[in-house]
């Protein structure tokens, strides 16, 4: 990227990269604490997706403990938690036609999604993020969807000073096209990276500061997910199924999930 390009710059107290659950929750909590203490705080959340939630692909079963701490009145605020988990089963698939249900007594407590102190919910993680973004903006957070963070801004001594938004109107070979617009610098006293498990800025920071030195290597899997519309007579809102085995090979780590959400929809995924 050319050093001669003249770029606009905006300054914030905190810049957060990624409008997922962690980034938006952090933004909300920062503004809550600032408002409670009467301090002025400028917080910006940058999201590469065209809208918040556009890149949040997973369906999920949520235990709302952290949400309860962040917004004790989340129900009154209209949080999209409308389908409580009602039945929870774990299976081992032997082939395309045979499955063995594991007895509940053999399932670790941490893997149970019904019963317990708090009701769990089958949710759309994308809808939850959109709702969190609304709460963040009400608190005074600036949320910028459609802007991908391209580089980390460092001082000469390596200190992180913010991020550089990617240029717009650039051809495949990197040359400017009609409508070219240089990316803006978002500078901050603190920069929080909430890109997810394998964000490209995070990878650069891990390498630069040797954050993985002496640590176990990360383990990654490919996940596939689909959203099915099924007949109402086959739909059981709140049914939560997990399992492993077929179609994965015996020496392959992974498993599958199947959640009955609202509106006769089923979230199914293979990892």
Regions found by a protein language model. Give the residues of each.
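Residues that act as N-cap/strand-start positions at coil-to-secondary-structure junctions
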Residues: 178-180, 252-253
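Conserved FAD/dinucleotide-binding core of flavoprotein oxidoreductases
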Residues: 250-271
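Short, well-ordered coil/turn residues at beta-beta hairpins
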Residues: 18, 166, 194-195
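Flavin-dependent oxidoreductases
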Residues: 204, 208, 225-252
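Conserved internal helical-beta-strand scaffold that buttresses enzyme catalytic cores
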Residues: 212-214, 241-243, 261-268
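N-terminal Rossmann-like FAD-binding beta1-loop-alpha1 element of flavoenzymes
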Residues: 13-44
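Conserved N-terminal/central alpha/beta ligand/cofactor-binding core
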Residues: 3-9, 39-172, 182-190, 200-203, ...
């Amino acid at each position: 990227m050319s050093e001669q390009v003249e770029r606009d710059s905006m300054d914030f107290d905190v810049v957060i990269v990624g409008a997922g659950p962690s980034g938006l929750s952090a933004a909300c909590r920062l503004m809550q604490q600032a408002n409670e203490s009467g301090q002025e705080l400028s917080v910006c959340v940058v999201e590469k997706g065209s809208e918040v939630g556009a890149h949040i692909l997973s369906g999920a079963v949520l235990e709302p403990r952290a949400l309860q701490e962040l917004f004790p009145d989340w129900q009154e605020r209209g949080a999209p938690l409308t389908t409580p988990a009602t039945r929870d089963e774990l299976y081992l698939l032997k082939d395309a036609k045979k499955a063995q249900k594991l007895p509940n007594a053999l399932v670790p407590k941490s893997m149970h999604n019904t019963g317990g102190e708090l009701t769990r919910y089958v949710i759309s993680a994308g809808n939850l993020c959109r709702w969190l973004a609304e709460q963040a903006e009400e608190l005074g957070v600036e949320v910028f969807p459609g802007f991908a963070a391209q580089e980390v801004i460092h001082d000469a001594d390596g200190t992180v000073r913010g991020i550089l938004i990617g240029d717009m109107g650039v051809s495949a070979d990197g040359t400017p096209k009609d409508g070219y617009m240089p990316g803006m610098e978002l500078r901050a006293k603190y920069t929080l990276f909430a890109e997810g498990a394998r964000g490209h800025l995070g990878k650069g920071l891990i390498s630069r500061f040797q954050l993985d030195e002496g640590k176990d290597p990360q383990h990654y899997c490919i996940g596939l997910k689909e959203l099915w519309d099924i007949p109402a007579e086959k739909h059981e809102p709140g049914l939560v199924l997990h399992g492993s085995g077929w179609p994965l090979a015996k020496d392959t780590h992974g498993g599958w999930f199947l959640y009955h959400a609202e509106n006769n929809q089923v979230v199914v995924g293979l990892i």
